[in-house]
Amino acid sequence: MSQHSQYDAPGVPVQPSLSFTQGFLLGQLSVVLLIGAFIKFFIFGEAPAPPSRGLASRTASHHRSYSINQGDNNVSNNNTSGGSPRTLCEKPSTSNVLRPVPSSATNTRSILRKTYYNAIPTQFSHTKQGRHRIQHSTHQPESLDWFNVLIAQTIAQYRQTAYLLKDSPTSSILDSLSAAINDPQKKPSFIDTIKVTDISLGEEFPIFSNCRVIVVDDPNSDGGRLQALMDVDLSDDNLSLAIETSLILNYPKPRSAVLPVALSVSVVRFSGTLCISLIPAATEQSPSSAPTPDASNLNVRTLFQHISAELNGTAANPTANPEKKGVPKTNLAFSFLPDYRLDLSVRSLIGSRSRLQDVPKVAQLVEARIHSWFEERVVEPRVQVVGLPDFWPRKGRTGVRPGEDAEAAAAVAAASASSRGGAPEATPSVPEEAIIDDSPVRPGLRFRGPAGRYDSGSSFDELPRAGPGLGEPLDIPGSMPGGRAQ
């Protein structure tokens, strides 16, 4: 009875949540959205920026931050530039074409941050003498192997040039050195004419190493001045100079006695720390922009001197000097730290008959004089300032390496001939013999006259071909001498 009641009870039908049509439309819509997202983000999306060299080895703190994407820096840049960023639709005025340089462009910390160089903060300490103390950098010192190779090539070229010009009457190193040491304004009267007997420019090269960049105090630059320190060592070389002269005794009468002297000075070893820095030169005020002195602020004598200078032409004239005025140039300043080492070997020979050889006192005097000369020029706090040349590319300084121009032209001609696949046309720089022999496709025999009839500059169209006339003898390449074309 219970089983019969179970079969007789009507089952409750399950209602589906979505119909078949609604599910089909939802599936199609999801597929369309997926395809649209794929096309938008994978096909029309912007390619990622290529990573810069050495980016993988940099730490997270080394990542470059662009000020255009930062709100604070963008506001500061807008304030320094004097307004909102310039758009392409705006037409800049003729006086404001070049955008202003940010004030932090030459800041030391900004340069170190953008070049990923770890240097200590600009904390300066002074010694008792008032000089700043060298602040060592926390960056790892760098080797200068590539710099040593360039310096060695330069020195080797100078040595070779000096040897090739040893017999030149104007550019000889012997004549230049003799004229320098025999300068009558510097040579004492008790020293006779100095004759150079031997010069050795050496065979070895200086080795630079352990380069590091530090920050030194400079009131003329923002945040201090960057300075590169590198160790230099030159040893086991034969740099030497030998001279002969005479000491003259001019009392009681001129040339009362003459004492021959021969000296030879050799550099045994030199080592020290070289300091290199770039110093921007001060902008020279152009004469046109120089203010005219006011007569009320000057007395009569000063005003008269100024007017006389202008009338006499001593004042600067912008048209008289072809060089550009008011353009600052960067200077290279280099010097050595006081802890340098310069070992010399001095040999002397005094007298004519009874000669004194290698007198210690003479060696001490010569070494002291050389050390004094060196310290007065390139030892801190004295520096040597050299103006850097103009490195802007110019047409007048453009050159082609020898032997590569002709090879490049021949390669271009051969490539164009092979790409056409037919009879190549001759160029004025390629001889006709090379064109005929190197032709990749030979549709038929090409006839040419005897050698010397046509110059190498004639083109392919000017070569003789088989004409309609039958009486003209034709030469076939490879035929016997005197043979006739049948």
UniProtKB/Swiss-Prot annotation:
<feature type="topological domain" description="Cytoplasmic">
    <location>
        <begin position="45"/>
        <end position="486"/>
    </location>
</feature>
<keyword id="KW-0812">Transmembrane</keyword>
<feature type="transmembrane region" description="Helical">
    <location>
        <begin position="24"/>
        <end position="44"/>
    </location>
</feature>
<feature type="domain" description="SMP-LTD">
    <location>
        <begin position="140"/>
        <end position="389"/>
    </location>
</feature>
<protein>
    <recommendedName>
        <fullName>Maintenance of mitochondrial morphology protein 1</fullName>
    </recommendedName>
</protein>
<keyword id="KW-0256">Endoplasmic reticulum</keyword>
<keyword id="KW-0446">Lipid-binding</keyword>
<dbReference type="GO" id="GO:0045040">
    <property type="term" value="P:protein insertion into mitochondrial outer membrane"/>
</dbReference>
<dbReference type="GO" id="GO:0032865">
    <property type="term" value="C:ERMES complex"/>
</dbReference>
<keyword id="KW-1133">Transmembrane helix</keyword>
<dbReference type="GO" id="GO:0005789">
    <property type="term" value="C:endoplasmic reticulum membrane"/>
</dbReference>
<dbReference type="InterPro" id="IPR031468">
    <property type="entry name" value="SMP_LBD"/>
</dbReference>
<comment type="function">
    <text>Component of the ERMES/MDM complex, which serves as a molecular tether to connect the endoplasmic reticulum (ER) and mitochondria. Components of this complex are involved in the control of mitochondrial shape and protein biogenesis, and function in nonvesicular lipid trafficking between the ER and mitochondria. The mdm12-mmm1 subcomplex functions in the major beta-barrel assembly pathway that is responsible for biogenesis of all outer membrane beta-barrel proteins, and acts in a late step after the SAM complex.</text>
</comment>
<feature type="compositionally biased region" description="Polar residues">
    <location>
        <begin position="92"/>
        <end position="103"/>
    </location>
</feature>
<comment type="similarity">
    <text>Belongs to the MMM1 family.</text>
</comment>
<keyword id="KW-0813">Transport</keyword>
<dbReference type="GO" id="GO:0008289">
    <property type="term" value="F:lipid binding"/>
</dbReference>
<feature type="topological domain" description="Lumenal">
    <location>
        <begin position="1"/>
        <end position="23"/>
    </location>
</feature>
<keyword id="KW-0445">Lipid transport</keyword>
<dbReference type="GO" id="GO:0000002">
    <property type="term" value="P:mitochondrial genome maintenance"/>
</dbReference>
<dbReference type="GO" id="GO:0015914">
    <property type="term" value="P:phospholipid transport"/>
</dbReference>
<feature type="compositionally biased region" description="Low complexity">
    <location>
        <begin position="67"/>
        <end position="84"/>
    </location>
</feature>
<dbReference type="GO" id="GO:1990456">
    <property type="term" value="P:mitochondrion-endoplasmic reticulum membrane tethering"/>
</dbReference>
<comment type="subunit">
    <text>Homodimer. Component of the ER-mitochondria encounter structure (ERMES) or MDM complex, composed of mmm1, mdm10, mdm12 and mdm34. A mmm1 homodimer associates with one molecule of mdm12 on each side in a pairwise head-to-tail manner, and the SMP-LTD domains of mmm1 and mdm12 generate a continuous hydrophobic tunnel for phospholipid trafficking.</text>
</comment>
<dbReference type="InterPro" id="IPR027537">
    <property type="entry name" value="Mmm1"/>
</dbReference>
<feature type="region of interest" description="Disordered">
    <location>
        <begin position="413"/>
        <end position="486"/>
    </location>
</feature>
<dbReference type="Pfam" id="PF10296">
    <property type="entry name" value="MMM1"/>
</dbReference>
<dbReference type="InterPro" id="IPR019411">
    <property type="entry name" value="MMM1_dom"/>
</dbReference>
<feature type="compositionally biased region" description="Low complexity">
    <location>
        <begin position="413"/>
        <end position="426"/>
    </location>
</feature>
<keyword id="KW-0472">Membrane</keyword>
<feature type="region of interest" description="Disordered">
    <location>
        <begin position="52"/>
        <end position="103"/>
    </location>
</feature>
